[in-house]
Amino acid sequence: MATNKSIKSVVICVLILGLVLEQVQVEGKSCCKNTTGRNCYNACHFAGGSRPVCATACGCKIISGPTCPRDYPKLNLLPESGEPNATEYCTIGCRTSVCDNMDNVSRGQEMKFDMGLCSNACARFCNDGDVIQSVEA
């Protein structure tokens, strides 16, 4: 019985991460002025809102090229972005809400491996695909 719960939990987490990681594809075509606008846009779009509606509601722009305008910086890890802690907070929030729920299901060796994969997925999501390797013993 516990094995079925573990499998169900892992499957649900994989599905949720799949949905979250799919949003990264969309994020590259929207630019927001600040973290609040980016979070608003992501939440709106994740809830099913269309890109143009979410962009208008959150003060963001939809672009066709790969570069955001200067007054609409993209959330990233560059020091000049002015928001270096935003990525760290994103990663912490993702790990807390998604990965910790997986950890509560089972504490076996396989789950530790899955937790590592979940943490890496959160890092990729929050860093817009640029993964910074963590040093963990």
Swiss-Prot record:
Keywords: Disulfide bond, Plant defense, Secreted, Signal, Toxin. One of its GO terms (molecular function) is toxin activity. InterPro entries: Thionin (IPR001010), Thionin-like_sf (IPR036391). Disulfide bonds join 31-68, 32-60, 40-58, 44-54. One of its GO terms (biological process) is defense response. One of its GO terms (cellular component) is extracellular region. It comes from the Eukaryota. Residues 1-28 form the signal peptide. Residues 75-137 form a propeptide. Pfam families: Thionin. It is found in: Secreted. Its main location: secreted. Belongs to the plant thionin (TC 1.C.44) family. 4 C-C subfamily. Thionins are small plant proteins which are toxic to animal cells. They seem to exert their toxic effect at the level of the cell membrane. Their precise function is not known. This is Probable leaf thionin.
